[in-house]
C-alpha cells in the first residue's frame, strides 16, 4: 500500500508493467501516471482514488485541556510540542498526544512533504529527524509504542474513536469512517482536521 512496498514487489518481479495494458490516453490522470513511472520507464499501478493526509484532532480533548486547536501551519516542532502538551493521565485513562498507525507512511510521510526528498532512490538519511522525534515520543509516552500496536492490532480508528489520542495523522478516507462512527456512537465527540505538519 505504499511506495517501498510496491518497489519491493517490483524488484521481486511480482508486479508486471502496465504500459501495454493501459493503451488509452492517460491525460485524465492529471500527471499521476508520470509520478508512478519508475526509473525504467514503466508504471505498475494506476490511481484509483485521490486521497491526501491530514491531521485529525479531538476538539473536546483540546477544550478540556485548555489548549488551542492545531493550526494549518504547524511545523514539526510545533506538532511535537502540542502532542507533548496534550498527553495526560495514565493506565486505562491515559490520553496520548498523538498516534501513529503501524504503516511505514504514518511516520515517513512527514519527511517527504517538502518535495525535496524521495524514498525511491534508496537514500533515507533525511528521515532521521522524523524517526528520532517519533522514537522520542514513544520513549516519553507521548504516543503508543509500535510494538504494542502491532501485537494488540489496535487500529488507528479505534484509538481515535475511543478518545485514546488527541491527534492522529491519517488520510482523507478516514473522514467518512468518522462520520459513520459518530452517527451511532454512544460517546460522541467533536473533531476537526488541519493541514499536515511541515
PLM regions and their residue ranges:
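Short glycine- and hydrophobic/aromatic-rich loop-to-beta-strand nucleating segment
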Residues: 53-57
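Extracytoplasmic/periplasmic substrate-recognition and gating elements
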Residues: 42, 65, 140, 183-198
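Alpha-to-beta junction loops
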Residues: 1, 162-170
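Bilobed periplasmic-binding protein-like "clamshell/Venus-flytrap" ligand-binding domains
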Residues: 44-45, 87-101
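Short helix-initiation/N-cap motifs at beta->coil->alpha
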Residues: 3-4, 74-80, 147-161
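Hinge/lid segment of periplasmic solute-binding proteins
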Residues: 2-52, 194
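Glycine-centered hinge/linker elements that transmit conformational signals in sensory
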Residues: 83-84, 119-150, 196
